[in-house]
Design a protein with these regions (language model features):
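An N-cap/entry alpha-helix motif that binds or orients negatively charged groups
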Residues: 1-69, 175-235, 371-385
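Alpha/beta catalytic cores of nucleotide-metabolism and tRNA/nucleoside-modifying enzymes
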Residues: 1-46, 291-308, 312-385
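A gly/proline- and charged-residue-enriched helix-loop-helix capping module
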Residues: 101-122, 126-140
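Alpha/beta enzyme core
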Residues: 83, 97, 118, 122, ...
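Active-site-adjacent beta-strand anchor residues
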Residues: 31, 109, 130, 255, ...
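Short, conserved glycine- and acidic-residue-centered signature motifs
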Residues: 92, 286-289, 347
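Glycine-rich active-site/cofactor-binding loop and its immediate structural neighborhood
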Residues: 72-111, 116
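Short, conserved beta-strand segments within well-ordered enzyme catalytic domains
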Residues: 49, 64-66, 75-79, 105-107, ...
Length: 385
């Protein structure tokens, strides 16, 4: 299969599987424990049916939305994710160039492999800096100060990762940063020489947001170790309220799953929340973001911008979430597999296909703008939600 033959998420995933060494593919593809929540994230959309209207005159369709005061050309964005230069040597640079062409939102992670200054200075799309709450309070402040100097518009604090999820695929392969593998994991690298050539013939792998604060040269640190040893499980609402005040700008919490927490986010002055279970990579057995979306929108949707991610593979998934009241919908694996498959060209094709699906499905729904979508367009198969 070639990139031009890729028509959907499954195709990008298959191309990525062929190109990547097994441990790296499984880092993207894997989730926590039995991966129940990971599967549930996508299955939740199948429990919801779309109800279209016809004869509405849909020659022109406007996909644009406003999110936390930022204008996006379409209601789908690329969620900030870690370690992207492991998947393709251009990493965040490739994603940023693709996103810039499509006028949507993207951001650098504190576990990103390109500096937030480089992305912020070279691209004009709405940019997010996604970070974690560390035990070192000085590090937290330094990250916010750095983001402010770089011109980042939205700070996004991930709040569902105070310790690492039990990602058993990574445990089996020995996946870590720097790479430290089991014998089986090393064999997986040996049979994917193209990836190795690209990885070792380009610039050194770095975590530029952390390298001034975290010494990883002395030994390998698994992602689970990073979450467990570096992040602060004592983080509470007072800590976050102080950070919101210090930032004095648009602040978003990623990983909100309950109505109570959504209301607290409003109370401390957040501009947005992302209803998310971290792609099923943290607490296995938790609900899907889509299943939680309606009650959270009902509680706070008129006071704060509610976004959602998790299991999004299709434009129809995005429309279902928008119909429930989400302002925009994010995804990680959707574009990461495309990045791994073909770099910038892969991400551009993934975003192109998503935009085509959104435009086509909007017309088939009888809607000319996102604001026309509502719960009148939905029916749920399950009687209990």
């Amino acid at each position: 299969m070639r990139l031009a033959q890729c028509c959907n998420y499954r195709d990008f995933r298959e191309l990525a599987r062929r190109r990547l060494p097994g441990p790296i593919f499984n880092y993207i593809d894997g989730a926590a424990e039995d991966e129940t929540t990971y599967r549930r994230n996508t299955l939740a959309f199948e429990d919801c049916d779309l109800v279209p209207n016809v004869l509405t005159g849909v020659a022109q369709v406007d996909l644009s939305v406003s999110v936390m005061g930022e204008r996006l050309a379409m209601p789908f964005y690329c969620s900030p994710t870690a370690l992207q230069r492991l998947f393709h040597y251009e990493g965040e640079r490739a994603v940023a160039r693709a996103v810039n062409k499509f006028g949507t939102m993207f951001g650098v992670s504190s576990l990103g492999t390109v500096s937030l200054e480089e992305i912020a200075s070279n691209f004009s799309f709405p940019q997010v800096y996604q970070f974690y709450f560390h035990k070192d309070r000085g590090l937290n402040k330094a990250m916010m100060d750095r983001a402010k100097r770089a011109g980042v518009r939205i700070m996004m604090l991930t709040v569902d990762s105070i310790t690492g999820g039990n990602r058993e695929r990574d445990l089996r392969t020995g996946f870590s940063i720097p790479l430290r593998l089991t014998l089986g994991g090393m064999m997986e690298f040996a049979i994917k020489p193209r990836w190795a050539i690209e990885y070792f013939t380009h610039e050194r792998f770095r975590l530029p947001q952390l390298e001034e604060h975290v010494d990883m040269k002395g030994g390998a640190m698994s992602i689970g170790d990073y979450f467990t040893n570096m992040l602060d499980p004592a983080m509470n609402w007072s800590d976050v309220a102080q950070m919101v005040k210090q930032w004095n700008g648009k602040f978003c919490l990623k990983g909100i799953m309950s109505v109570d927490d959504a209301r607290k986010a409003v109370d401390i002055g957040c501009a947005g929340i992302v209803v998310s279970n971290h792609g099923g990579r943290q607490l296995d057995g938790s609900r899907s973001g889509f299943d939680q979306l309606a009650e959270i929108v009902d509680a706070v949707g008129d006071k704060i911008d509610v976004l959602v991610d998790g299991g999004v593979h299709r434009g129809s998934h995005v429309l279902k979430a928008l119909s429930l009241g989400a302002k925009a919908v994010g995804a990680g694996r959707y574009y990461l597999f495309a990045l791994a498959a073909a770099g910038q060209a892969g991400v551009e094709r993934a975003l192109h296909l998503m935009r085509l699906e959104l435009e086509r499905d909007m017309r088939l729904m009888g809607c000319t703008s996102v604001s026309q979508l509502s719960r009148r367009n939905l029916r749920f198969r399950s009687s209990v939600r």
